[in-house]
């Protein structure tokens, strides 16, 4: 493992720009400013709502080189400066020895930021190739191996919180995947105890939309590392759910936000899980049942305007 503390170098000299370049730059800067404000607000709200980071925490920011983890690191570095509490950050990348992985990209970027970081080198690629038949999705095994390595190294580093870059859309996709394929009403929690019981995992981007993160990543110029270096086939089930949600978001603006709100407003008494609600001891004298029999009343639905997905491509940036 390579462990480095670095300082930020001098800023590179500016270049001469034409008037058209200046106009485009001004527009992008305004757009970036709006996105920055929005993402910082949502990240800060998620951290506060779930008490993700506390005084004296050492946060391992898991950095893959993708848009989500770059954005998460950027948000947390800002929070570190602005928050009323003191906490430290160490950015960690797991180099899994995938063919063609650009080993210089992340160290160069992190040295430029002046953030403490560690590069953990483990050849999980060879293990995955040996265990998974050619042409099959390797993501599941790769993810389990990666988690185990990160968790064990977190203990060695004295880390108190492990930050992952999953966002709102990941959480909704996981909800539908579990419903469709596992028969479970289960999503991806913003905060949890890790598999080994020794770490607390947090997802600071839990309230952030993937499209906002993607736009922010482009405008910020992050040096993105592609996630298909291993040659694995994309998870078809997740891809189908992602496409379904994207179509809904275009046809029915606001539906994604409403569905995510549902994750935060669960009514166990109006589901069918005896383990989540004590139906056995329910009797007519119990008047504390949430919402009572209003479930039989007609729902008051807010009408939405259907949009032709072919005619009106939409990118929403609030």
From Swiss-Prot:
Domain of life assignment: Bacteria
Family assignment from sequence similarity: Belongs to the TtcA family.
Cofactor notes: Binds 1 [4Fe-4S] cluster per subunit. The cluster is chelated by three Cys residues, the fourth Fe has a free coordination site that may bind a sulfur atom transferred from the persulfide of IscS.
GO molecular function: 4 iron, 4 sulfur cluster binding; ATP binding; magnesium ion binding; sulfurtransferase activity; tRNA binding
A Pfam family reported for this protein in Swiss-Prot or TrEMBL: ATP_bind_3
Cofactor(s) this protein requires: Mg(2+); [4Fe-4S] cluster
Compartments, as annotated in UniProt: Cytoplasm
Organism annotation: Pseudoalteromonas atlantica (strain T6c / ATCC BAA-1087)
Keywords: 4Fe-4S, ATP-binding, Cytoplasm, Iron, Iron-sulfur, Magnesium, Metal-binding, Nucleotide-binding, RNA-binding, Transferase, tRNA processing, tRNA-binding
Subunit-structure text: Homodimer.
Catalytic activity of the protein: cytidine(32) in tRNA + S-sulfanyl-L-cysteinyl-[cysteine desulfurase] + AH2 + ATP = 2-thiocytidine(32) in tRNA + L-cysteinyl-[cysteine desulfurase] + A + AMP + diphosphate + H(+)
Pathway assignment: tRNA modification
Binding positions ([4Fe-4S] cluster): 139, 142, 230
HAMAP family (alphabetical): TtcA
Record region (Disordered): 1-29
Protein name stated in the entry: tRNA-cytidine(32) 2-sulfurtransferase
Other comments on record: The thiolation reaction likely consists of two steps: a first activation step by ATP to form an adenylated intermediate of the target base of tRNA, and a second nucleophilic substitution step of the sulfur (S) atom supplied by the hydrosulfide attached to the Fe-S cluster.
Broad class of the protein's primary localization: cytoplasm
InterPro entries in the record: Rossmann-like_a/b/a_fold, TilS/TtcA_N, tRNA_Cyd_32_2_STrfase
Job of this protein: Catalyzes the ATP-dependent 2-thiolation of cytidine in position 32 of tRNA, to form 2-thiocytidine (s(2)C32). The sulfur atoms are provided by the cysteine/cysteine desulfurase (IscS) system.
EC assignment: 2.8.1.-
Bias (Polar residues) ranges: 16-27
């Amino acid at each position: 493992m390579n462990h480095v503390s670095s300082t930020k170098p001098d800023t590179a000299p500016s270049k001469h720009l034409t008037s058209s370049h200046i106009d485009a730059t001004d527009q992008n800067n305004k757009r970036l400013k709006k996105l920055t404000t929005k993402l910082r607000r949502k990240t800060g709200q998620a951290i506060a709502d779930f008490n993700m980071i506390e005084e004296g925490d050492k946060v391992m920011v898991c950095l893959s080189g993708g848009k989500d983890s770059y954005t998460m690191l950027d948000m947390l570095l800002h929070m570190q400066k602005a928050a009323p509490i003191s906490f430290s950050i160490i950015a960690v990348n797991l180099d899994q020895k995938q063919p063609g992985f650009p080993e210089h990209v992340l160290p160069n970027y992190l040295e430029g930021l002046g953030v403490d970081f560690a590069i953990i080198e483990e050849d999980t690629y060879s293990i995955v190739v040996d265990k998974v038949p050619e042409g099959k999705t390797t993501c599941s095994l790769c993810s389990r191996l990666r988690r185990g390595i990160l968790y064990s190294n977190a203990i060695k580093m004295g880390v108190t919180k492990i930050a992952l870059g999953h966002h709102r859309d990941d959480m909704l996709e996981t909800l539908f995947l579990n419903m469709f394929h596992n028969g479970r009403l289960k999503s991806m929690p913003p905060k949890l105890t890790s598999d080994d019981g020794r770490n607390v995992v947090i997802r600071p981007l839990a309230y952030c939309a993937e499209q906002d993160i993607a736009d922010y990543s482009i405008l910020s110029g992050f040096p993105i590392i592609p996630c298909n270096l291993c040659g694995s086939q994309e998870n078809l089930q997740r891809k189908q759910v992602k496409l379904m949600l994207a179509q809904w978001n275009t046809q029915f603006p606001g539906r994604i936000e409403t569905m995510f709100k549902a994750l935060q407003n669960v009514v166990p008494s109006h589901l069918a899980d005896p383990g989540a609600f004590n139906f056995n001891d329910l009797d007519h004298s119990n008047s504390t049942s949430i919402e009572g029999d209003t479930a039989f009343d007609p729902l008051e639905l807010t009408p939405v305007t259907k949009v032709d997905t072919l005619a009106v491509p939409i990118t929403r940036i609030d």
